[in-house]
Amino acid sequence: RTACHNEGRDILAFSLESEALKEKKISIVLDFPYGASDITASDWTQNDRHRTTILQTSDEKMLLWRQLDRDEYYAGIYAQGGKIRKEGSHTLRIFANGEKLDISIALGKQKEQAECLSAQEVMNASKRGGRRFWERGGIIQLNKSADPRARELERRIILSQYLMAINSSGSTPPQETGLTCNSWYGKMHLEMYLWHCAWLPLWHQEELLDRSLAWYREHLQQARENAARNGYKGARWPKMIATEGVDCPSNIAPLLVWQQPHIIYMLEMAYRRKRNRRFLEENWELVKETADF
């Protein structure tokens, strides 16, 4: 079984059960790569360009500090029913004590964010989050349709909601393929934000949209400065960015403006669901400055 926390923590959990674990015929390897711009986002050949440092360790738990160039984060590993051993510069191997092994891996920019929960706690949180998502959101039933394609269409609708929620509803506008893979070198393209997230308020999932709407408010001043540099008033949103909201190097992307109206449209859809004066007050400046440009 595999699950993610689904209630605000970056934790993955795995639960394994096999006689092969008990007999030591199999073990679990956890390896950390260097970053890359290709589709996997991983470079396994540059061992000397990143660091994996053990800060705390015991048989079942280990806290790591990871450094890649100027980026750093913490990783906590909890192997319930097992032993963790470091084998190489960036490689851990986990052996089971018996036929059952539960592993959880927590990641965070701060040390306390890497404090691991048990795999069962993570799976319980995942179930609660999943229940909230499906009970709150909209659904379409096609079971009474006579069209032979109805069942497959319904399956795809359900699957699409799940995939878009887990891959594209984080705290920043998603990159072009969300978290599925590392397309366009991991950059976010704001004209794609609409295609990833506009469905959320239409399907009663506006709370998931709120996560990334906050990014626009936090970077409004940068958008104003971007417009001013070009001789305009208001806020000009860049096309291709990293999380900082600054135009990525390109001979064409900084000239494009097709991403500009998306945020106004999505705020309007979110407001139609909320009908909340506080929401208007919180986002009015964002709408006005974007429209002024």
Predicted regions and their residues:
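Elongated scaffold/linker segments in the mid-to-C-terminal portions of large proteins
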Residues: R51, D71-A75, A79-G81, A253-V257, ...
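Helix-terminus loop motifs that line ligand-binding clefts
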Residues: M164, S168-E191, H204-Y265, Y271, ...
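Generic hydrophobic, aliphatic-rich segments that mediate packing or membrane embedding
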Residues: L12, R156, M192-Y193, S212
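Conserved hydrophobic/aromatic pocket- or pore-lining residues that grip, position, or stack substrates
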Residues: S160-L163, H196-C197, I263
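Acidic/polar, glycine-enriched structural segments that form the non-catalytic walls/loops
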Residues: R1-K187, E206, R217-R224
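Residues at structural and domain junctions
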Residues: C116, A146, N182-S183, W195-A198, ...
